[in-house]
Amino acid sequence: MRISQICTVLSTVTSAVAVGVNPLPAPREISWGSSGPKSIAGELQLRTDSDSADGIVADAWNRAWETIVALRWVPAATEAPISSFEPFPTPTAGASKKSKRASNSLQYVNVQVKDIEADLQHGVDESYTLDVEEDSDTITINAETVWGALHAFTTLQQLVISDGHGGLIIEEPVNIKDSPLYPYRGIMLDTGRNFVSLPKIFEQLEGMSLSKLNVLHWHIDDAQSWPIWVDVYPEMVKDAYSPHEIYSRNDVRNIVNYARARGIRVIPEIDMPSHSSSGWKQVDPEMVTCTDSWWSNDDWPLHTAVEPNPGQLDIIYNKTYEVVGNVYKELSDIFPDHWFHVGGDEIQPNCFNFSTHVTKWFAEDPSRTYHDLAQYWVDHAVPIFQNYSQERRLVMWEDIALSADNAHDVPKNIVMQSWNNGLEYISNLTARGYDVIVSSSDFLYLDCGHGGFVTNDPRYNVMANPDANTPNFNYGGNGGSWCAPYKTWQRIYDYDFTLNLTETQAKHIIGATAPLWGEQVDDINVSSMFWPRAAALAELVWSGNRDANGNKRTTEMTQRILNFREYLVANGVQAQALVPKYCLQHPHACDLYRNQAAIQ
């Protein structure tokens, strides 16, 4: 059996009348009644006897209710059939509405959670049901865990809207049965290239919570800077950009706690052995190599890094593993998640030419290759990482298993994050039995299409198109962005990443992450670079991109994501505009094709 599309959404949407709300991500099953609006009493009171010891449910409800009351949300972009246009006018039938009797006002939110002790770890049950009945004064939420209850609240926030007269309503009785397609749904934040402040990190977590993303992959450091304090080697933060651009232990705890309160796991990444210069060299300069080399775009065959600045851990130097082990243990102690990302991407062989330890190791046995060197890292570093605890699960970039100089044997219990060659590498990794996080750069890299950041680049100094018939650097080419073009929300949403996988292979896909590499990102633009495009991924991995008949629902998604962008902004997330406001107010008037089934 072959899976021809990303798991067809099991979503069922039934409605006897039109409603304005259009929650994102779309629930798996939602059924609307037709008896008329359910008004909200002065305050919806939470009733539950099943909360966690630290009050996760109560705190989340308080935040949700405060948001509902403060916003008194009016949907900014509602769904409607495409309008009639000249020269093909269509008569408009007179509309009529039957009168509807008033129903009981809603006064309570009753929440029942089966397992209040379930920890926020990979695979935890996030399902919930939400029911608003015609003759009831209670919104009923049932969830297997508190984390499912939190998702119910974020759905409810989008269902309760202004009645236009100062009150609040839910437009019709509604029944929702919801759960995610994939357990791993994330974005990646890079704070190694540019520092991102705590308030801005919190802002991303708000967007994630509203869209039901549940993993913040935190790429903490890179060759350019080491921004996190570690007690064991306090000198490492000498390579932070400034004393004000350091994450303290308390900062990390605040980020983790803020995320957990919203059902979001924080998975740290320390990229090793490549992308490693800052921080490490302060502990022992001998444990890093090629840090003082020119990265060498001038003579690419000799390059020591794919971008400035170079630096890698010395794989053969014994003390490397002592220092790495100490840093890893300390960071593992302050991040409660069972998963830890240990990098493994873009190892540059030329960098090791600057290491006397590595060159001597090669000289001792001329049959040795860079594959053997990568395997040396796996054999010596991975046991240190895995032995932290029985629950520990490692994540690595695919390069360690698939690059030109990959290791021979990478344990199958390591999760591979796939970023190159799209469907080809996904198929390769899953066929070999690896669990895979999809981060294909052709679809999910959010920094793509913004040009290059390296300066002194003569390629831009061209005043006329040198070849009008062939795309080139400044004329139809990538303009310095290696992964151009820009990934629009439609590009992200349309990604069928299980295409042509067998059923067995498809089971190895645990989810997806949209990375935002930080070379051109800081506090000023981080939110607009993530949002609302990350919301397209959120729906893709929550309920899919197809309807119950297997048809792509990108056209249907349009008004939903346009409305959600406005909702993000109303909640303090500085999401980028996607279209002229005219398009929000005129459903599908900005479609490329009048044919509403143009996308298959």
UniProtKB/Swiss-Prot annotation:
Q: Where is this site: Important determinant of glycosidic bond specificity?
A: 306
Alphabetized, the UniProt keywords read: Carbohydrate metabolism, Cleavage on pair of basic residues, Disulfide bond, Glycoprotein, Glycosidase, Hydrolase, Polysaccharide degradation, Secreted, Signal
**Which residues are annotated as active site?**
222 (charge relay system), 275 (charge relay system), 346 (charge relay system)
The catalysed reaction is:
Hydrolysis of terminal non-reducing N-acetyl-D-hexosamine residues in N-acetyl-beta-D-hexosaminides
- Whether DNA damage counts among this entry's keywords is no
**Thermal dependence of function as given in the entry:** Stable below 45 degrees Celsius.
Q: At what residues does the UniProt record annotate the site feature described as Not glycosylated? A: 525
Q: Give the practical application.
A: This enzyme can be used for synthesis of lacto-N-triose II (GlcNAcbeta1-3Galbeta1-4Glc), a major oligosaccharide component of human breast milk, and its positional isomer (GlcNAcbeta1-6lactose) from lactose and D-N-acetylglucosamine (GlcNAc) by reverse hydrolysis reaction.
Question: What kind of modification does the protein receive after translation?
Answer: The precursor of the propeptide is intracellularly processed in the endoplasmic reticulum by a dibasic peptidase, different from Kex2, removing Lys-97--Arg-101 from the precursor producing the activated propeptide. The propeptide binds non-covalently to the catalytic domain. Propeptide binding is necessary for full activation of the enzyme, dimerization of the catalytic domain and secretion of the active enzyme. O-glycosylated. O-glycosylation (O-mannosylation) at the C-terminus of the propeptide is necessary for full enzyme activity. N-glycosylated. N-glycosylation of the catalytic domain increases the stability and solubility of the enzyme, especially at low pH. Contains high mannose-type (M4-M11) N-glycans at the C-terminus. N-glycan deglycosylation does not affect enzyme activity.
For biological process, the GO terms are: glycosaminoglycan metabolic process; polysaccharide catabolic process
**Disulfide bonds, which pairs?**
290-351, 448-483, 583-590
**GO cellular component terms listed in the entry, alphabetical order:** extracellular region; membrane
Q: Which residues form the propeptide?
A: 19-96
- Sites carrying sugar chains: 78, 83-84, 318, 353, 387, 428, 500, 525
The record, for InterPro entries, names:
Beta_hexosaminidase_sua/sub, Glyco_hydro_20_cat, Glycoside_hydrolase_SF, Hex-like_dom2, HEX_eukaryotic_N
How does acidity or alkalinity (pH) affect activity? Answer: Optimum pH is around 5. More stable at alkaline than acidic pH.
Function statement: However, hydrolyzes both GlcNAcbeta(1->6)GlcNAc and GlcNAcbeta(1->6)ManNAc. Part of the binary chitinolytic system. Involved in hydrolysis of chitobiose and higher chito-oligomers (produced from cell wall chitin by endochitinases), thus contributing to the formation of germ tubes, fruit-bodies and septa during hyphenation. Hydrolyzes synthetic substrate p-nitrophenyl-beta-N-acetyl-D-glucosaminide (pNP-GlcNAc).
Q: Which family does it belong to?
A: Belongs to the glycosyl hydrolase 20 family.
Description of how the protein assembles with itself and partners = Homodimer. Oligosaccharide moieties may also take part in the dimerization. Dimerization is a pH-dependent reversible process. The individual catalytic cores dimerize and the catalytic core of one subunit in the active dimer interacts with the propeptide of the second subunit.
The identity of this protein, by name, is: Beta-hexosaminidase
UniProt organism field: Aspergillus oryzae (Yellow koji mold)
Q: Which lineage do the record's taxonomy fields give for this organism?
A: Eukaryota, Fungi, Dikarya, Ascomycota, Pezizomycotina
